[in-house]
C-alpha cells in the first residue's frame, strides 16, 4: 500500500488540539502497522516543518525529524515537476490553492498513487481518495 502524506495530516498527527488529531493518530498508527509506504515531497516536508515551528515550536520540529521523517519516503521535487505544479496552480486559478498541493498532485500522478492521507478537500477535487474517509 502506497499513501501520499499531506501537510494537513502531519500537522494533525502532531497537534493534540487539532480537530482531527484522534482520527489522524489512529490512521497514522494503522499505516505504520501495515508497513504502508508513506510518501511525501520535500516541499510537503518544508511546509510541515515551517508550520509546525510557527504553531508549536522547535520541539515539534524535533519530533518530526526524529520520529516522522525516518518512516517517510521523501520524493525530491524535480525541476519539471516544480514547473508542472506552477502551471497547474495557474490553470486552476484558485487563490486558496497552494503550489505545494499542486506539486503533490503532479507527483501522485507520476507515481501512480491514488490515496492521500490528507484533510484537504483539494485532493478530492483533483480526483484522489482522501484517508481517513
Q: At which residue positions do the language-model features occur?
A:
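Short, well-structured N-terminal submotif of metal-dependent ribonuclease cores
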Residues: 1-39, 53-66
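Short acidic, glycine/proline-enriched helix-loop-strand junctions
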Residues: 48, 66-79, 86, 92-94, ...
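Short active-site oxyanion
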Residues: 34-38, 71-73, 112-114
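Acidic, PIN/NYN-like endoribonuclease modules and their adjacent C-terminal/linker elements
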Residues: 105, 110-133
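Histidine- and aromatic-rich ligand-binding microenvironments
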Residues: 2-6, 40-41, 97-98, 120, ...
